[in-house]
UniProtKB/Swiss-Prot annotation:
Record PROSITE patterns: RIBOSOMAL_S2_2
Protein name per its UniProtKB record: Small ribosomal subunit protein uS2
Domain of life per record: Bacteria
Entries under NCBIfam families matching the protein: rpsB_bact
Source species: Spiroplasma citri
CDD domains according to UniProt: RPS2
Keywords (A to Z) from UniProt: Ribonucleoprotein, Ribosomal protein
Region listing for Disordered, in residue ranges: 232-295
Family indicated by similarity: Belongs to the universal ribosomal protein uS2 family.
Gene Ontology cellular-component terms listed: cytosolic small ribosomal subunit
Presence of keyword Ribonucleoprotein: yes
A GO molecular-function annotation: structural constituent of ribosome
């Protein structure tokens, strides 16, 4: 059952922090409580009221046996969106939004069918009969399709609602949903235009803790309405002790700007980036600040690891912390939190023939 959110929980997650006052959108004024040190403070009571509206929407969607599409392509939102969608048996997009994902669903289905065909060939052993070069090309094609379409390969019809972490970042997805009259739920920061959004959730959309607590709450509301027995989040919001905003909060152009670091410090935010979420792409996630071990590490038998759904990150996440530490030492990686170790090990390992091997 969905745990009731309180203002204290949202405050602890840093959901109240908006953008600098000079970067606000005046249309967000009704959701702003005030300002401090030239930073807007979001009214968290408004956030709670808006979540109650979303709860009613979830009941309506559940009555129609509909699904939700979760969208979040920002670094700090990718893994959260995937985890939340999988928990409530819905769909997600956590890589670049492909134009026409909603408005041209038939074409997207053709690419999904291609992905299914490759998976069927792998399962039947047909790929092993092909030349090695062709096998490699098909494997690359499969990885690319899985990366962009893996979260929606079971979506046979349009979703009943679209949940977006940052509507400014995901404006194409919002525009497609509006065109098809699909209700849009979105976490709206103080720099967002709320007009295209049907269900506004005013909150900080740049920190992992804020994104996680709201996204998982939306998943819980949907799961409760559908009567789904949901597992616990793979990485809980409470695991994040640092309020790590990304470059997007300091620079609208997406590039890091040291001249604007003062704004982050005025919020009381830590400027370190050592606690990042795991990601399956090529983006590198910073690791902890502990010194790298130089001693030889004990060997680890990869054959003892049970591969889950041919997914490296999911497989590593099932391991115990001490097992991850042994693996990390084998690559001269520092001991860190579980999420960090999973992220770093994913850069050094891969899955071949349903077995984990070194790259």
């Amino acid at each position: 059952m969905a745990k009731e959110l309180t203002r204290e929980m949202l405050w602890e997650a840093g959901a109240q922090f908006g953008h600098q006052t000079k970067r606000w959108n005046p249309k967000m004024k009704p959701y702003i409580y005030g300002e401090k040190n030239k930073i807007h403070i979001i009214d968290l009571q408004q956030t709670l009221w808006r979540l109650e509206d979303v709860k009613k929407l979830m009941a309506n969607i559940a009555a129609r046996k509909g699904k939700i599409l979760f969208v979040g392509t920002k670094k700090q939102a990718k893994w959260i969106v995937k985890d939340a969608a999988e928990r409530c048996e819905s769909f997600y997009v956590n890589q670049r939004w492909l134009g026409g994902t909603l408005t041209n669903l038939k074409t997207i289905h053709l690419r999904v069918k291609r992905l299914w065909n490759i998976e069927r060939q792998e399962k039947n052993g047909e790929l092993k009969l092909l030349p090695k070069k062709e096998q490699m090309l098909i494997k690359k094609e499969k990885d690319k399709l899985e990366k962009f379409l893996g979260g929606i390969k079971g979506m046979k019809e349009l979703p009943q609602a679209l949940f977006v972490v940052d509507p400014k970042e995901e404006h194409i997805a919002v525009r497609e949903a509006r065109k098809l009259r699909i209700p849009v739920i979105a976490i709206c920061d103080t720099n967002v235009d709320p007009v295209p959004i049907d269900y506004i959730i005013p909150a900080n959309d740049d920190t992992s803790r804020s994104i996680a607590i709201i996204t998982h709450h939306i998943a819980d509301l949907y799961g409760d309405a559908m009567g789904i027995k949901m597992p616990e989040p793979q990485f809980k919001p409470s695991e994040f002790t640092r309020r790590d905003g990304d470059e997007n909060r300091n620079s609208r152009g997406g590039q890091y700007d040291n001249r604007r670091m003062s704004g982050r410090n005025e919020r009381g935010r830590d400027t370190h980036y050592s606690h990042k979420a795991p990601n399956s792409g090529k983006e590198e996630a910073p690791v902890g600040t502990e010194p790298v071990a130089t001693t030889s590490a004990p060997s680890f038998n990869f054959n003892t690891i049970n591969v889950v759904d041919n997914d490296l990150e999911k497989t590593l996440s099932k391991l115990k912390v001490d097992e991850l530490e042994i693996l990390s030492e084998g690559f001269a990686l520092p001991k860190a939190k579980k999420a960090e170790m999973v992220s770093e090990l994913s850069k050094h390992l891969t899955i071949v023939d349903n077995k984990i091997v070194k790259k």
